Design a protein with these regions (language model features):
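A bilobed periplasmic-binding-protein/Venus flytrap-type ligand-binding module shared by bacterial periplasmic
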Residues: 138-150, 257-270
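Short helix-initiation/N-cap motifs at beta->coil->alpha
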Residues: 88-99, 187-215
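A conserved helix-loop-strand patch within extracytoplasmic ligand-binding domains
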Residues: 131-180, 286
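Periplasmic-binding protein-like
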Residues: 168-175, 280-300
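Short, well-ordered beta-strand elements
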Residues: 54-66, 84-90, 157-158
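Bacterial lipoprotein signal-peptidase II cleavage site
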Residues: 17-45
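Sec-dependent N-terminal signal peptides of Gram-positive bacterial secreted proteins and lipoproteins
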Residues: 1-26
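Ligand-binding "clamshell"
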Residues: 119-131, 146, 236-248
Length: 301
């Protein structure tokens, strides 16, 4: 820091000398640019000092691969500039990342939404909390050989995910498109299941595990439909623009099912967690999401 102070002092004296000699506007602009750059360097150095003050500059985060792991990889260098070493562990299920955070193996995870986190806490006696919403992945209704909702044939088969929160989203999407009717008070927070369907309009609705919906759709008969979560659609190579319908971005599903950063209760204000959140909620990340996922992933901060 003494070195930094010396640099700033030298720059200040230089600027005064140039002003006394009647320096040009261009020279003043150059000096201002140098001062701005130096200030930015000082801010980065200060962040690095905070990160390493207690030796805790490693951020261990668990995530599913698409898009969570990819987004984390994007911010890895940005966190390094702040003095943090982001270490990413990729999981292919929705149980182990929460257990790893609860057990202290990870500092945070990024793969789930709040309803799932609440359900996991209740079932496992854990105390994990959300510290930030990052994005949501719109559910899409896809048709095999069907080009519009109006063309869905009577008695068509519709496959939807079976777990509670995903089943709710799928059913709300089907209702949004007029394919089924649910109770008037049906909403994302309270949840619904196929047992709550008031009128299925003759469609054959079946539930399967969320991670198998895309595969079943790929092997389905012509005229069949499926409601697929955004990340599974991405992994299966489906383009959200080909979906017959997607969740309304202004609906409560977008906020309710936003993907979050989860940590142990009490860790919310750790410097490294604050750094992780602020970096993930930056304009650079929003632009990255917009440019790489074609609407299948939507920033929500």
């Amino acid at each position: 820091m003494k070195k930094l102070s010396s640099v700033l002092l030298a720059l200040s004296l230089s600027a005064l000398a140039l002003t006394g000699c009647g320096s040009s506007t261009d020279t003043s602009a150059d000096t201002s640019a140098e001062e701005t750059t130096t200030a930015a360097d000082a801010e980065t150095e200060a962040a690095a000092d905070e990160a390493t003050a207690d030796g805790d500059n490693v951020i261990k985060v668990g995530a599913t691969s698409t898009p969570h792991g990819e987004i984390l990889e994007f911010v890895k260098d940005k966190l390094a500039e702040q003095g943090y070493d982001l270490q990413i562990t990729i999981y292919d299920d929705y149980v182990l990342p929460n257990k790893a955070v609860a057990d202290g193996e990870l500092d945070a995870n990024y793969f789930q939404h709040t309803p799932y986190l609440n359900s996991f806490n209740a079932s496992n006696g854990t105390d994990l909390v959300s510290v930030a919403k990052i994005h949501y992945e719109p559910f899409g209704l896809y048709g095999n050989g069907v080009t519009s909702v109006a063309d869905v044939a009577e008695g068509a088969s519709i496959v939807i995910p079976a777990d509670d929160s995903n089943e709710t989203r799928a059913l709300l999407l089907l209702q949004q498109e007029g394919l089924i009717e649910l109770p008037e008070d049906a909403n994302a927070n309270d949840g619904v299941t196929t047992l709550d369907i008031v009128d299925d309009h003759g469609y054959n609705i079946t539930t399967v595990q969320a991670d198998t919906v895309a595969a079943q759709f790929a092997n389905s008969d012509a005229g069949s439909l499926a409601v697929i979560n955004g990340n599974y659609a991405l992994a299966a190579g489906l383009d959200i623009s080909t979906a017959l319908a997607v969740e309304d971005a202004s609906g409560d599903a977008a906020q309710t099912y936003a993907n979050i950063i989860a940590v142990r209760n009490g860790d919310e204000n750790l410097p490294k967690i604050r750094a992780l959140v602020s970096t993930l909620q930056s304009d650079d990340v929003k632009t990255y999401i917009e440019e790489n996922y074609n609407g299948a992933v939507v920033a929500i901060f």
